[in-house]
């Protein structure tokens, strides 16, 4: 991924040209010729195509301060019924306290259809716009274009006025539909420095900067003695240099979410902005963007986060004394407290950084979101005399946290860190996991420990190895193959299995085996309650040859890799697995009485990138037995786009090879 952060106010025209290609589309200017194309070379299978998506953000004076003015104009061609979703739009407006909030204006939308050679326009009526208060801070406006059918062209435009200079809107040049032209213009007065953060793989066709001179007229109430209002309004006009930045991307392909992706938002072609400093005339530069130490300081003062950790929390004392009774070391103390919180608290939301309830309420109710539960864990560990801190991170589905800039909005999760001796332990009591185990969704890169240094920590999937061991012993009795299956799934597979058994019971887990084997008996799942490690699955089975002249048997039975998870011919963004992997399968098989081996698959050993993985398929006959071993090993979880085809072909080969069969022929 191209990921860059820079103060673009420092960029010279060598990087940003000055040519301004004007937006040529006008609202309502649709001709019959616009309906002629029914598919586009950019994506012949697309259900809708964005013909143009044009946006701008500029500053205007309002009273004694600035407001941001965001404009958008979008035109879309609906190609089939599956593309009807493109006719629905949602706008999110934010509140900033003190009766300040975003306002939408000049909202207009229309659908155009070609009827009898003429363009027929159907406008969106005001009653078709629905407003919903999402929470105390967010309002959603939603509308769906009327009279949409296959071949329709829709368009809408609107303006959003924002009183907050923090609210310079990001722009997505890419989405679920291909786009012929996406363009964004931003005008920034010299009074503000913004950090521009760009990402994505699609290259801009144009990237320009033009410096212009603009005037801003501010109006404010004249003040009398002792700050009293005189009722007289004064105005002052200030001239300023404004840098006009403009990005244009053409023929942008749709970005489709594929298997093994952290979050599509990590890879979409996009640009966003973070206010860094204000520089008003005659005043010193005012830094706005926080630092990691300042972010920590603020978080630990928030009622909705860390303020309770600085208190005595005496209400915990009796319970902690009971829990830690008999503990002989700090690690044993930490384990006892962790197990208690994990086993007795219920998590209501696994994506929340803020605490909605006071710490004491969460402690008493034993219920809360992930941050609330793990903040209780931190508080209890501290109350027990241990050195513990919250850790903030972003889960896989939430996108990456930025390691360079302390952007609080990128984080959505809290875990606990506790040190015992020279060991650091990372704990999450919101899931039924072992001590020092984190859910796979937490392995998403950059995180911060909220200690005095605000230490950076990486939770990389490459560092997480998931191992799976499976063995089958197959013996013959009176012409019937009888087997014993034994498997240690990966730790994360065990977590999922434990949840399935808790919800539906063991019988539901074993039921699919009835379609594979003639008979299944003595099924057990061991270590279900031993959360420190994986479970152990065991069962006996029978496999009838039915006296057939020819018996075809896959040595891996139902454990073979049946399909390639990588379907696309190519991929523009990385493959991001949950972990590195090491899966070993062994079979020791007695050839059934009355049969001989007609054909065995050939053994093979294939390396992935020499030392980054391997596929082993070894099979041999010794006397009346067949020994078989298959191993898939990948030493890393993340693969750049240029390795995608190699990885896809690697799994293609695995699917084909693990699908091969042992052929047994009845003796004459």
Model-found features: residue ranges?
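Secondary-structure boundary elements
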Residues: 291-365
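Sec/Tat-exported extracytoplasmic proteins
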Residues: 82, 162, 324, 341-345, ...
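Short coil/turn segments at secondary-structure boundaries
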Residues: 86-90, 198-200, 308-315, 336, ...
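Short His/Asp/Glu-rich catalytic/ion-coordination signatures at enzyme active sites or charged loops
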Residues: 131, 315-319, 362-363, 629-637
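Beta-strand-rich, non-transmembrane domain signature
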Residues: 19-289, 299, 359, 372-382, ...
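Bacterial Sec-dependent N-terminal signal peptides
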Residues: 1-23
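A carboxyl-terminal module marker
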Residues: 510-668
């Amino acid at each position: 991924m191209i990921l860059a952060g820079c103060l673009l106010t420092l960029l010279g025209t060598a990087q940003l040209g000055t040519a301004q290609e004007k937006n040529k589309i006008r609202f309502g200017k649709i001709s019959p010729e616009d309906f002629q194309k029914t598919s586009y070379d950019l994506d012949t299978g697309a259900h809708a195509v964005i013909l143009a998506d044009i946006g701008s953000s500029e500053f205007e004076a309002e009273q004694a301060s600035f407001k941001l003015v965001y404009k958008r104009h979008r035109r879309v061609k609906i190609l089939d019924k599956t593309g009807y979703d493109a006719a629905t739009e949602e706008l999110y407006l934010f509140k900033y306290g003190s009766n300040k909030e975003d306002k939408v204006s000049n909202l207009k939308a229309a659908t155009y259809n070609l009827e009898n050679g003429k363009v027929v326009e159907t406008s969106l009526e005001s009653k078709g716009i629905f407003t919903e208060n999402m929470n105390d801070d967010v309002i959603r406006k939603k509308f769906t274009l009327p009279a949409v059918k296959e071949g329709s062209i829709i368009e809408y435009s609107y303006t959003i006025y924002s009183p907050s200079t923090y609210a310079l809107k990001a722009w997505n040049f890419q989405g679920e539909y291909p786009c012929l032209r996406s363009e964004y213009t931003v005008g920034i007065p010299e009074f503000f420095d913004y950090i521009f953060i760009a990402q994505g793989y699609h290259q801009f066709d144009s990237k320009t900067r033009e410096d212009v001179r603009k005037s801003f007229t501010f109006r404010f109430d004249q003040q009398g003695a002792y700050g009293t209002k005189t009722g007289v309004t004064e105005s002052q006009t200030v001239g300023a240099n404004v840098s006009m930045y403009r990005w244009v991307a053409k023929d942008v392909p749709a970005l489709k979410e594929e298997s093994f992706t952290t979050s599509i938002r990590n890879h979409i072609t996009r640009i966003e902005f973070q206010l860094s400093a204000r520089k008003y005339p005659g005043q010193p530069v005012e830094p706005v963007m926080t630092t990691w130490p300042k972010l920590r300081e603020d978080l630990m003062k928030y009622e909705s986060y860390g303020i309770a950790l600085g208190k005595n929390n005496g209400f915990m004392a009796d319970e902690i004394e009971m829990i830690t009774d008999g503990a002989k070391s700090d690690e044993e103390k930490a384990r006892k407290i962790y197990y208690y919180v994990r086993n007795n608290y219920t998590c209501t939301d696994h994506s929340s950084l803020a605490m909605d309830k006071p710490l004491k309420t969460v402690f008493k109710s034993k219920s809360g979101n992930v941050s609330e539960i793990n903040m209780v864990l931190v508080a209890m560990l501290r109350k027990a005399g241990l050195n513990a801190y919250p850790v903030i991170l972003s889960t896989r589905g939430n996108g990456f946290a930025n390691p360079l800039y302390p952007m609080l909005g990128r984080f959505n999760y809290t875990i606990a860190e506790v040190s015992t001796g020279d060991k650091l332990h990372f704990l999450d009591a919101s899931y039924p996991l072992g001590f020092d185990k984190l859910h796979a969704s937490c392995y998403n890169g950059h995180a911060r420990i909220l200690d005095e240094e605000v230490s950076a920590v990486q939770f990389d999937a490459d560092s997480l190895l998931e191992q799976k061991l499976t063995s089958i012993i197959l013996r013959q009795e009176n012409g019937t193959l009888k087997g014993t299956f034994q498997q240690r799934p990966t730790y994360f597979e065990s977590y999922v299995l434990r949840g399935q058994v808790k919800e539906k019971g063991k019988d539901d887990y074993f039921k699919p085996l009835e379609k594979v084997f003639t008979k299944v008996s003595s099924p057990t799942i061991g270590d279900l309650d031993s959360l420190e490690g994986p479970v152990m699955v065991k069962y006996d089975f029978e496999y009838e040859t039915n006296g057939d002249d020819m018996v075809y048997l896959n040595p891996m039975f139902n454990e073979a890799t049946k399909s390639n998870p990588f379907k696309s011919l190519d991929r523009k963004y990385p493959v991001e697995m949950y972990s590195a992997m090491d899966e070993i399968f062994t079979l020791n098989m007695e050839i059934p009485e009355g049969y001989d081996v007609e054909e065995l698959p050939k053994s093979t050993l294939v390396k992935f990138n020499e030392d980054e993985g391997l596929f082993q398929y070894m099979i041999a006959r010794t006397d009346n037995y067949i020994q078989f071993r298959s191993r898939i090993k990948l030493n890393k979880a993340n693969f750049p786009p240029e390795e995608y085809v190699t990885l896809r072909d690697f799994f293609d080969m695995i699917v084909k090879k693990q699908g091969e069969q042992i052929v047994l022929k009845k003796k004459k």
